[in-house]
Amino acid sequence: MKKINSGRLVLAGLVASFAFIFVEIIVEGSMHFLFRISEAKFYLEAFEMRKSGVLFHILNLGILFAICILIMWVYAAIRPRFGSHGKTAIVASLIFWLFAFLFTANHVNLGIFPPMSFIGMGFNLIELPVAVIVGSAIYREG
């Protein structure tokens, strides 16, 4: 079994992050334009807090980069078993999405998150596979 190429893993994660942001702008922007549905609006209404500033945006991007690098690590870990094609990227993104969905469902059940959080999970069901497929095009084993 080949070792995971750490440099390529980080690069693939960063590329996946940019792909995620691009698809998020298209998907969520379209939904907001067509149906006036906004994930950010639901969270702002539920938590009544307005975050902004440079540190907020730097941390938000840093967390997104970390998430995408972790997803690409899942992809790299299952790649020897599933092969290096789009199916593996989709499986990795669905594994990650399922963990996030169960975490969100638990918090909705506890009353911590609003039920509208599932709309964001629906958006992620589109955004994550595309991001991992784009990232998988960059990743190569070392």
How should each PLM-predicted stretch be described?
Residues 1-142:
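Juxtamembrane/disordered regions of integral membrane proteins
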